[in-house]
UniProtKB/Swiss-Prot annotation:
Name by which UniProt lists this protein: Large ribosomal subunit protein bL25
SUPFAM superfamilies in the cross-refs: Ribosomal protein L25-like (SSF50715)
Protein family: Belongs to the bacterial ribosomal protein bL25 family. CTC subfamily.
CDD domains, per database record: Ribosomal_L25_TL5_CTC
Pfam families referenced in this protein's UniProt entry, alphabetically: Ribosomal_L25p (PF01386), Ribosomal_TL5_C (PF14693)
Residue stretches of biased makeup (Low complexity): 188-203
Length: 214
């Protein structure tokens, strides 16, 4: 994905506030040299941030007529308004090793025996994983095939088919669960409400006791 950045001349809290009022977003690019202070068009950045690829893939930043490869590292949003306050990028090249969280794309869920045969549901325990690799080989996402998952089974990190150069960063966790089949609770049948027995109507032609005594 591509985006355009411009030099940010003014600095400080007041300058950043005026920049935001004018529809711009202050940002910084660090790594492989001196930090580069930039500004971006707010609306263009806001819409780009809605795309998954903008968060988890190499980006081509056009700056002063030249292209640089960067990764999105941090976004600061306003507490209650749909406004981007600040953005950080990391400058990288093909030889830079990076760690980055990438989303998981789950496929074949409807074909899993635990779903198709046993009417279970698949719980997605995690939806993204942190990976380490060369910047040039960073995957936009990881595909998780759930097609063989049966009742009572779980899919773990070690079960994933990763690109050869990509390694999952576990940070002390041992083979965590990615997804698991859970069974739906059986619905209890509603209790039958006893219907009161209607009193039998008195037979025709019979007189009451009082009438017989007369």
């Amino acid at each position: 994905m591509k985006f355009v950045a411009y030099p940010r001349e003014l600095q400080g809290t007041g300058a950043s506030r005026r920049l935001r009022i004018s529809g711009k977003v202050p940002g910084i690019v660090y790594g492989a040299g001196e930090p580069l202070k930039i500004e971006l068009d707010h609306n263009a950045l806001f819409h780009a941030l809605k795309k998954e690829a903008f968060h988890a893939s190499l980006l081509d930043m056009e700056f002063n007529g030249k292209s640089q490869q960067v990764l999105l590292r941090d976004v600061q949003m306003h507490a209650f308004r749909p406004q981007v306050l600040h953005v950080d990028f990391q400058r990288v090249d093909a030889t830079t090793r990076v760690t980055k969280k990438v989303p998981l794309h789950f496929v074949n869920e409807e074909n899993a025996p635990g779903v198709k045969l046993d009417k279970g549901l698949i719980s997605h325990v995690v939806t993204e994983l942190e990976v380490e690799c060369l910047a040039s080989q960073l995957p936009e996402y990881l595909t998780v095939d759930l097609g063989e998952l049966a009742k009572g089974q779980s899919l773990h990190v070690n079960d994933l088919k990763l690109p050869p150069s990509v390694k999952v960063v576990l940070r002390g966790k041992k083979n965590p669960v990615i997804a698991t089949v859970v069974m739906q609770a059986a619905e209890e049948a509603p209790a039958e409400v006893a219907t009161p027995t209607a009193a039998a109507p008195a037979a025709k032609g019979k007189k009451s006791e009082k009438q017989n005594k007369k």
